[in-house]
Amino acid sequence: MRTYSKVVINKKALRMAQTGHPWVYGEEVVRIDGPWQTGDLVDVYSEKNKYVGTGFINDVSKIRVRLVSRNANDTFDDAFWRRRVDYALAYRRTVMGEDDFSCCRLIFGDADEMPGLTVDLFSDVLVTQTLCYGMDRIKERIFKPLVEGLSTYGIHIRGIYERNDVKVRELDGLTQYKGWYEAPWLPERPGKPMTTICENHILYDVDIENGQKTGFFLDQKYNRLAVSRLAVGKHVLDCFTHTGAFALNAARGGAISVTAVDISEEAVERTISNIEKNDFSPTVKAVQANVFDLLTQLAEEKNRDYDFIILDPPAFTKSGHTLKNAYRGYKEINLKAMKILPRGGYLATCSCSHFMTDELFRRMLKEAADDAGVSLRQIEGRQQSPDHPILWNVRETDYLKFYLFQVV
């Protein structure tokens, strides 16, 4: 017999839930029957007493309930979570294939019905981030079957590193921290929080302790290959390079020269290390500079040294409140890149902000092209790699826009 407390939701929340969206906001709750604490599982019902689903409740977050199931018969025991993990692993093994499975995103939150949980596999290390209070409480039920499941594919994990050092955790009532996860079924001494991965036949040192997000951006894996195919014989400017991934893929594709730019000293140092690791010097050089200032300077000088520019900025907005400023920022860098490129040059441009929708991004690019007095010939329009699956009924899972253009 089920003993979960009952959350009754209004018609607006019911309509969203019926489309498959897993979130219930605080203002959409009509009443709660029975005792509960943040992080508990609760059953969600309509005002007509129809079962909607079961999820984690939170009295701190604006999202009051995050659904994890719509089956009233689920028991949420160890076997339930193991099935979820096995399904996630099997999906990645299928869509990524054996070669790309050793460094990919294994769990992508709501897209895998494990809200607020991110797990990235970097060779012999799992890097995790937990943003949902309820998932944080039961994470061992996820971590252990992940490690056991990976071993069946011949991947042996030496440690799990938690990157819970993000302020957004506080919105769910969680504290910030980072460090190795300790459990009796894991090695006692996992070693340094560094590892090496191979992506697209290129080696990278990954700083899982201090690198951005979980240490390496896996979502651009196949977009980098698209850049590599176009880079042969080109002089490439890679802006916001982070660890140099686009730059190194351009070099591997046959670029004559590549300049990788980032404002972060640590990012430039890591890029230099990756250049040396792959023997791409002197083809690739890393430069510490403010990309906005550099693009302004090159545009004013009418510099024609580059015939391929890559723009992969961090998210300029993480909320709808700052979208207008973000729009201007995206337009500024794209406009300047279009002014710098010669006719027939190539532009790869991205946005990783969910709030900057594809429609807005395309509108911004059209405005930038009009202002620059150029036309854009689209070569490819792409999204995140399939280990970051997009659920059409959960729009928040669709966030990465990537376009390749020829400027004509």
What are these regions (language model features)?
Residues 257-262:
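Conserved SAM-binding motif I beta-strand of class I
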Residues 107-120, 139-216:
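Non-catalytic substrate-recognition/targeting regions of SAM-dependent transferases
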Residues 243-256:
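Conserved SAM-binding loop of SAM-dependent methyltransferases across substrates and taxa
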Residues 306-336:
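Mobile active-site "lid"/loop adjacent to the S-adenosyl-L-methionine
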Residues 305, 332, 346-408:
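C-terminal catalytic and target-recognition region of SAM-dependent MTase-like enzymes
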Residues 1-123:
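Non-catalytic accessory regions of SAM-dependent methyltransferases
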Residues 266-310:
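S-adenosyl-L-methionine
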Residues 233-242:
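Conserved class I S-adenosyl-L-methionine
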